[in-house]
Amino acid sequence: MSTITAAEVNKLRTMTGAGMMDCKKALTESGGDFEAAIDILRKKGQKVSAARAENTTSEGIVSITVSADGKNGKLVALACETEPVSKVADFKNLSEAIMAVAVAKKPATTEELSALPLADGRTVQEHIIDLTGKIGEKVTITSYVSMDGEQVVPYIHSNGKLGVMVALKNTGGKDCSEAGRDVAMQAAAMKPVALDKDDVDPKTVEREIEIGKEQARAEGKPEAMLEKIALGKLNKFYKDATLLNQEFVKDNSKSISQMLDGFHKGLTVSAFVRISLS
């Protein structure tokens, strides 16, 4: 069995807010698997976010450009290893050039984007390789998303490392950017794992039910009641972790779905993406 280090224990504590000894026991039980350790903590009743703490070491720039008609948005995340590199001119210029060619050529995938030529004829990937050699850090496109909708609304957090795009539908031709920005900021802050209940990964649903049962069992609830209790906890998970069902942070008497419908009858979200470099 591998030895669990103090750094790993502290990392899990930072991710979950659980006590040091609880984190050590969970990591030991899981063999050092952080995702499994989080599930162990939750089964034992620890108040750990089901959405999972972000656990990346990337720095870089997340940029978004929306078309003039507001019906398409493109997000590009260009990552490096350290914050100082993300602020140098060569890195910023490459990020801007990649976005410009994405807007002009409309690639469907990251692979297609990487193969596109920039102004000097060399491809995006060749420029990335050159910059990696020049600065001594790995540079990579970690995310590229092209999103269509009746109205696409962007949000970039002030640190430039977190971006959200929201596609609205049933706008009725109305400018709904104000409501869309509220939704995008909600997604940035509350980290939903899916748009609505039906969009949650079935494996996640199964895991939440199992965790709910274990929590109820640990509380001494009768076996015959475990399924019902677990389904109740699952409904709370949906409320906490799916965007349309989350409480609106600006007015918790409403869900996001209700806020949108109040802004314009029938207004809703057809898609969203949240990308963070941290």
Curated annotation (Swiss-Prot):
Chain positions covered by the region annotation Involved in Mg(2+) ion dislocation from EF-Tu: 82-85
GO annotation, cellular component aspect: cytoplasm
Superkingdom classification of source: Bacteria
A GO molecular-function annotation: translation elongation factor activity
Keywords, sorted A to Z: Cytoplasm, Elongation factor, Protein biosynthesis
SUPFAM superfamilies found in the cross-reference section: Elongation factor Ts (EF-Ts), dimerisation domain, UBA-like
Coiled coil: none
UniProt subcellular location: Cytoplasm
Family annotation (InterPro entries): EF-Ts_dimer_sf, Transl_elong_EFTs/EF1B, Transl_elong_EFTs/EF1B_dimer, Transl_elong_Ts_CS, UBA-like_sf
Family annotation (HAMAP family): EF_Ts (MF_00050)
Annotated NCBIfam families: tsf
Family membership: Belongs to the EF-Ts family.
Function: Associates with the EF-Tu.GDP complex and induces the exchange of GDP to GTP. It remains bound to the aminoacyl-tRNA.EF-Tu.GTP complex up to the GTP hydrolysis stage on the ribosome.
Record protein name field: Elongation factor Ts
